[in-house]
Amino acid sequence: MYRIGNGIDFHRLEINPNRPLVLGGVECESEVALVGHSDADIILHAISDAILGALALGDIGQYFPDTDPKLKNIDSKIILAKCLELMKERNFQLVNVDCTVIGEKPKIAPLKEKIKKSLCSLLDLPVDCVSVKATTTEKMGALGRQEGIGTFCTILLVKNL
């Protein structure tokens, strides 16, 4: 049995030299950071939501509510690990991941290989099963005004026999 999951996440950008920009588990050099209750890693959030969606288990807000002060600044790798644990408990495994980052800034092209390598490690997938792409909104809307960035992610799960 196969299951497909989709995940979407958006966060605002702010100039904050005291907060790192984290994408796909990688701390990226940038003058901007993402605003969020957690480390605001939009890629790991979208992947986590895609896994939960494929399993019909809701979303990360149910497991990691932004109203819980104990979760303030939580590392999104912990969120992803919990979602992978739920997946394995149900005897599924990840087949592939396809992520698209949307925004004008920061430029993703110079970061893609680091992010992809991190995702391969975190997800225990080979390089040819992880895709990281980027696009812009051609300066339209909030993302075009560099107020934030987002990620769309699609994953495929297969049930282990």
Curated annotation (Swiss-Prot):
Cofactor(s) required for function per UniProt: a divalent metal cation
UniProt record, GO biological process: isopentenyl diphosphate biosynthetic process, methylerythritol 4-phosphate pathway; terpenoid biosynthetic process
Catalytic reactions on record: 4-CDP-2-C-methyl-D-erythritol 2-phosphate = 2-C-methyl-D-erythritol 2,4-cyclic diphosphate + CMP
Assigned EC number: 4.6.1.12
Cofactor, how bound (note): Binds 1 divalent metal cation per subunit.
Class of enzymatic activity (EC top level): lyase
A Pfam family matched in the record: YgbB
Binding site residues for 4-CDP-2-C-methyl-D-erythritol 2-phosphate: 9-11, 37-38, 59-61, 64-68, 135-138, 145
Site entry: Transition state stabilizer: 37, 136
Alphabetical list of Gene3D superfamilies matching this protein: 2-C-methyl-D-erythritol 2,4-cyclodiphosphate synthase
Molecular function in Gene Ontology: 2-C-methyl-D-erythritol 2,4-cyclodiphosphate synthase activity; metal ion binding
Source taxon at top rank: Bacteria
Keyword set, alphabetical order: Isoprene biosynthesis, Lyase, Metal-binding
Pathway of action: Isoprenoid biosynthesis; isopentenyl diphosphate biosynthesis via DXP pathway; isopentenyl diphosphate from 1-deoxy-D-xylulose 5-phosphate: step 4/6
Record-linked CDD domains: MECDP_synthase (cd00554)
Positions contributing to a divalent metal cation binding: 9, 11, 45
PROSITE patterns in alphabetical order: ISPF
Family indicated by similarity: Belongs to the IspF family.
Function: Involved in the biosynthesis of isopentenyl diphosphate (IPP) and dimethylallyl diphosphate (DMAPP), two major building blocks of isoprenoid compounds. Catalyzes the conversion of 4-diphosphocytidyl-2-C-methyl-D-erythritol 2-phosphate (CDP-ME2P) to 2-C-methyl-D-erythritol 2,4-cyclodiphosphate (ME-CPP) with a corresponding release of cytidine 5-monophosphate (CMP).
Subunit-structure text: Homotrimer.
Entry protein name: 2-C-methyl-D-erythritol 2,4-cyclodiphosphate synthase
Name of the encoding gene: ispF
